[in-house]
Amino acid sequence: MKISIFILLLFISSMVIISVNAETETIQTNTACDCDDDCDDGNRWSTDMCSAGLLFGKYCTHTQICCDDENACTIDSCSKTSGCVHTPINVDDKNPCTIDSCIKGFISHTQISCDDKNACTIDSCDCSSGCQNKPMSCDDNNPCTVDSCNNSTGCRNTPISVDDNNPCTIDSCSKSTGVVHIPINVDDLNPCTIDACTKEGGVTHTPVNVDDNNKCTTDSCSLFTGITHTEICCDDNNACTDDSCSPSTGCVNTPISCDDKNPCTVDSCNNSTGCCYTPINVDDNNPCTIDACTKSTGVTHTPINVDDNNQCTTDSCTKEGGVTHTPVNTDDNNPCTVDSCSPFTGVSHTPINVDDNNKCTIDACTKEGGVTHTPVNTDDNNACTLDSCSPLTGVTHTPINCDDKKACTVDSCSNSTGCVNTPISCDDNNPCTVDTCDDSTGCCNTPINVDDNNPCTVDACTKSTGVTHTPVNVDDNNKCTIDACTKEGGVTHTPVNTDDNNACTLDNCSPLTGVTHTPINCDDKKACTVDSCSNSTGCVNTPISCDDNNPCTVDSCDDITGCCNTPINVDDNNPCTVDACTKSTGVTHTPVNVDDNNKCTIDACTKEGGVTHTPVNTDDNNACTLDSCSPSTGVSHTPINCDDSNPCTVDSCSNSTGCVNTPVNVDDNNPCTVDACTKSTGVTHTPVNVDDNNKCTIDACTKEGGVTHTPVNTDDNNACTIDSCSPSTGISHTPINCDDKKACTVDSCSNSTGCVNTPISCDDNNPCTVDSCDDLTGCCNTPINVDDNNPCTIDACTKSTGVTHTPVNVDDNNKCTIDTCTKEGGVTHTPVNTDDNNACTLDSCSPSTGVSHTPINCDDNNKCTVDSCSNSTGCVNTPINCDDSNPCTVDSCNNSTGCVNTPVNVDDNNPCTVDACTKSTGVTHTPVNVDDNNKCTIDACTKEGGVTHTPVNTDDNNACTIDACTKEGGVTHTPVNTDDNNACTLDSCSPSTGVSHTPINCDDSNPCTVDSCSNSTGCCNTPINVDDNNPCTVDSCTKPTGVTHTPVNVDDNNKCTIDACTKEGGVTHTPVNTDDNNACTLDSCSPSTGISHAPINCDDSNPCTIDSCNNSTGCCNTPINVDDNNPCTVDSCTKSGGVTHTPVNVDDNNKCTTDACTKEGGVTHTPISCDDNNACTIDSCSNSTGCVNTPISCDDRNPCTVDTCTKEKGCQHSPIDTDDSNKCTIDACSSTTGVTHTSINCDDNNACTFDSCSNSTGCVSTPISCDDKNPCTLDSCDKKTGCCNTPINVDDNDKCTTDSCTKEGGVTHTPISCDDNNACTTDSCSKSTGCVNKPISCDDSNPCTVDSCSNSTGCCNTPINVDDNNPCTTDSCTKSGGVTHTPVNVDDNNKCTTDSCTKEGGITHTPISCDDNNPCTLDSCSPTTGCVNKPMNVDDNDACTTDTCNKDGTITHTPINTDDNNKCTLDACSPKTGVTHTPINCDDGNKCTINSCSPSVGCISTPVSCPKPKDKCSISQCDSAKGCIEVPMNCTSDKCNEASCCDGVCTSKPISCPKPKNKCQVAKCDLIKGCTVSNVVCDDGNACTEDSCCSDTGKCQFEPIKLPKNKNKCIISKCDPIKGTITNSTVNCECDDLCNIGECCEDTGKCNYRQKDCDDNNPKTADSCDSKTGKCINKPYNVITSGSNLISGLIGGLIGGGTGGKGDCKTCKN
């Protein structure tokens, strides 16, 4: 048992030893030993050691080294001789096609590579023989390729060259048809070209020949309308041509014929108006002919009839002097005959009757001495007696009665001058009164009525101006009203109409500036809109188009910066694509090349994992392919051929059913193409024919809008054309016809306003014609009628002098006649008045020697008279007294029989009296009743004019009356009320100066009062007039202070005036300027409240505008922003509906999109997913039907790829390696051409470089030179277009030069010619606008001409035709009066005819009947006077009887009444000479009277009216001896004024009182005392100042009174300026911040402030003070807060609750 345990222990021990070192093999033997040498076993590959045993003793151990090479593919052993041995294991599988190996213990048999690096062999390995390299076949069964093989790249199927060098074919090749050469479509869809193609010239588009060989058409061709032949306009704008057109020669402008077959006109033609028929000048410059022209006779010069039907003239006419009517010489040189001439009977020499049957004259006549009547001398040298001589009674000296019973005269008699009835003067020198004198009551000065019953005048009358009717000032100083005044409505202020019917203006009106039409600001501040304004609708903000036709940009618009074409983000976040975008292709995501050149791997790339090379699964589960894989060619799935040779199908193969030929989707979603597909042409997208065969529409088609036919704009902005459009011919601009068919206008057309019919001028510059114009015939220059119906003038007219009326020569060479001529009586030769006012001479006259005065013989051979002669009265043959005391008889004495008492003739031949005679009253001539019951007229009657009713002059020139007149009350001169209700004045009125109130003397010896009288109590001591001539002071005077001048209160309590006062202008209340320069307020002013700026109402009642106002421009109605920032709504606004947000229509009628709209993303058309999770189908969608999953054909017909398809991956096309190591080629492989090494395009898109290529470095771009050595170009280079030799801008911005540049001369600026060869324009040139051909004005301001203009000759002022075809009018036209049709003078100067005129019969002269049914007349008719009912001769040759014929034809001879009721004559009658009324002599020898005689009272001596003196400061007086003299005017004044006369007015100039030496005294003047001195009063109204005056300067000084000084400067003493009392107050140191405690420092008077102490001595609180309440706030800190908050809290506590220190007191009440 013990042994067993021992053995077990040994085993365990040995196991422990062995296991201690696993890397060595240690063998312990039972050989005992003492040292290592005892244990050598002779094996050098072991370590021999002597070591202690496990339990007891020492034993030898042999440790074998380790031979493990850590290679599982070797058998490791150790040989005593050689050591470690590592024997490879046997891996050979006996297969030549594998390489056998062992790696880390794993045996592998790797298939060897049989790749011979020849792409033209199919490499494989045979299990028996090893590698095999068989040549491969490259035939692709494609007639379009040349098949070959390249050892490095493999099969090459190079596309054959299909180019037949014919530009007229499209060369192509297809698998089914082979090479084809299809003729190209040369049609450019332009009807204006002939499209063709030739091998030599290629495609040509030759312009068609549009010429129709017709010169009457403009031939053209338009892309839209094709060839058109538009008729040309042959109108040469010449009214003198007939315009037509000949197809062979073109326009024909044949001159028209203007011959009117009238010899009386000059026929011409005006280019602008047409035929012009100017009357010829028929004037032969001979005043002795009547020049005329008629159509039948032509021009005639008929001698005028010079006979004036006056036998007293010799009538003749000479070319030089014209018509003369020379008076015949009637003088027979015999003073004893009266030589006369009657126009009807001729010259007569009637013996004069020298017998005056007057015993008071001696009558005689001798050829030498003529007739003499020597008067008797009746003068007793007493002007107060009436000295007379009666042929019957002789000389009498009757005292005259000078009483005229009139209150208006002062009656007297002067022995020297006789009666003086001096009219009193009632003239009050007041134009506002009617000054009259009533014979019973005296002077009357009635105020005139100034009221003109017109509310639009201020009616007044002043002494200086008289009656004035001043128009009222209707101007309310408001330019927004039309101010007017009408008699009916008075003053009106009608608001102006500010609306200019233009929605583009803001219409407003300012009272100061008037109506304004401020253009509204349509700028919406958006760069994305074109802002404009429509006059009818207002602002239009049209969005601009930002489409740059670049698919690589997102086109948008920013309202601030404008169009933004942001490059799109092409990154699809897919590592498997190369992302790019070009303008031609748009965004492309080109797959990355994942090819690892191992065609048996699926080289792929996923968005998540990137590029992967997964071994291919050659099984495509597709019955349509043969699946295989070759390392060189890869997996092949050879498709079955499903090509049906139909380009209209997508040929594919269904995994389950076989070939699928799906019709292609030809819809390109473009409404502008007709999409189709045919077997011959394939898919075509033919542009739709948009032509609607309507030349009036612009036909177009856009992808968005489809076909549109937009009407063309026919407006050529020319008012002279009618713009229209014909669907067949297109737009036409037909010139409008401006011909008004009037020869009197020049017809033209203005492009801006349309027809202009300008009147022509017919002025022939001949004053002897009436120039007019007839709309049919043109100018008419009718000779004027020069006859002024005045026999005293010779009437003529010449071109140089015009119409002249030369006075006739009336001298008959007879000194005994006064030769005159009157319009009524013609030439008269009135016998001169031979009377020398000496009654004692016989006054006569000899035609040759003139008047003579021969002393008369006063013996009247009449026993009834005593004969004598008085120088004043002549012969005095004092009648015997035959008075029978019957006033109704003329008492006379018959030279032979004695007294004769003949009944008086009461008829005074005065239509103004009713004549009668009674014994009691005598002869009465009762004035007719002229009263028209209107007391405002002076009803009168004169012998000549009969009854008249003259409006009275109510002005009595009396300032003391109010003059007026009423129909009922007549003229009234109401005395003015002179009573001033002041008993202390003497009230009076002077007719010249007006009312005066003379004060009584109430002098109280007080220099400060004007002593006057109280109305009720007597004397009143009124303050003197202290007026310092300063309207700005209230002047007063008090006894203690003297005169004071207190400034006036200018305040008119009207807040609308600036109240001021100046010495010159006085108090003024200037209207304030209410304009606040703010167009947004209506500025006005109320007297009570002042200026107000009421905001104007800018509400335009349009919910679509934000109504605001701009201070400078006024109302601004800005369109509101209707954008709700929601792209899902169409935002708009209308006046009626306001803002609307209509949901957008998101339906794009596309079943392939999910249409939606969100506020964030806008409208989206999210394509629906048609993915069937089968990568082998083309998942598409038809817009009309929805998803289509068409099996794809993976045949890309690309020899460069191996095509496969899996449900998961889809088609796989592995690219071949095309690199030829040439940097000048793009190595590629094309499905049609195979691998190509296309020369790279080194075009850097920079036309400014010469691009080339280096095989080693690639493209080289060398800059080109663009210098063309031409000074007229700016040489530059444009990257896009290349050299740009841009003509320099030679424009000098002067449109008056032609700017050019030549290679030789450089830039030139040649002045242009603005001559338009049109005489009707003023040609000039404007730098800014160019030629200005301004039409000249042909207006001659003559209504008698049609003013026109001829392009060649200029202005044509053609006389208008004034003929109204009425023989009863004289038709004429004058510059001032225009056309007049004056009734013709039908008077044939034959008063024996009734002259008339009718339009039908013309002038007729019907004989009148002169039968007066009176047996006492011989009835006849005189052409000059008319009916003559000549009384039969009943004359008994007794001049003292009235011979009459009675109604029954019997004749009676009644004695005449010699009394002419004229006290100024001595009345007598001689049977031979008849009644005589010898004037009496009334001369009183007084130069201050005008001696005259009144028929009713006799002699009158009227005071002379002396003329106003030349010196207005003199007055006229009359001296009886000298007559009128001038004496200075007497002007009086008071003691303060110096009186003088200035310009006829007494003026008083204030005297200048001497200035006192003391400047604190002022000089003043007392009206009674004169100059006095008073002290200056200095009172500033402040009781706290001491007022004084500085005697040096005279200026007031106002020194503040001295306030008591306080030791405590915190006490302030103040003075009350009104009461003058002194009060003390303390400085207020209180603050608005109640945490500041203020105290006043007594030493300085200044406030010191300290912060209120709120420290509660608690470190755990933040101490502060509330400034509003003054209360302390002790807020515990928040100890949980962060450190920063704690610090800020502590700082806040320290700041807020600090103690002491000066607080911040920003606002103190002090």
Curated annotation (Swiss-Prot):
Glycans are attached at residues 150-151, 270-271, 415, 535, 655, 751, 871, 894-895, 1015, 1110-1111, 1183, 1255, 1351, 1530, 1624. Keywords: Glycoprotein, Repeat, Secreted, Signal. Pfam families: Dicty_CTDC. GO terms for molecular function: structural molecule activity. GO terms for biological process: culmination involved in sorocarp development; extracellular matrix organization; response to catechin; socially cooperative development. InterPro entries: ECM-enzyme_regulator (IPR052846), S_mold_repeat (IPR001673). Cys-rich CT repeats lie at residues 43-70, 71-94, 95-117, 118-141, 142-165, 166-189, 190-213, 214-237, 238-261, 262-285, 286-309, 310-333, 334-357, 358-381, 382-405, 406-429, 430-453, 454-477, 478-501, 502-525, 526-549, 550-573, 574-597, 598-621, 622-645, 646-669, 670-693, 694-717, 718-741, 742-765, 766-789, 790-813, 814-837, 838-861, 862-885, 886-909, 910-933, 934-957, 958-981, 982-1005, 1006-1029, 1030-1053, 1054-1077, 1078-1101, 1102-1125, 1126-1149, 1150-1173, 1174-1197, 1198-1221, 1222-1245, 1246-1269, 1270-1293, 1294-1317, 1318-1341, 1342-1365, 1366-1389, 1390-1413, 1414-1437, 1438-1461, 1462-1485, 1486-1509, 1511-1534, 1558-1581, 1582-1606, 1608-1632, 1658-1682. Induction: Induced by the putative stalk-specific morphogen DIF (differentiation inducing factor). Residues 1-22 form the signal peptide. It comes from the Eukaryota. Coiled coil: none annotated. GO terms for cellular component: extracellular matrix; extracellular region. It is found in: Secreted. This is Extracellular matrix protein A. It comes from Dictyostelium discoideum (Social amoeba). The gene is ecmA.
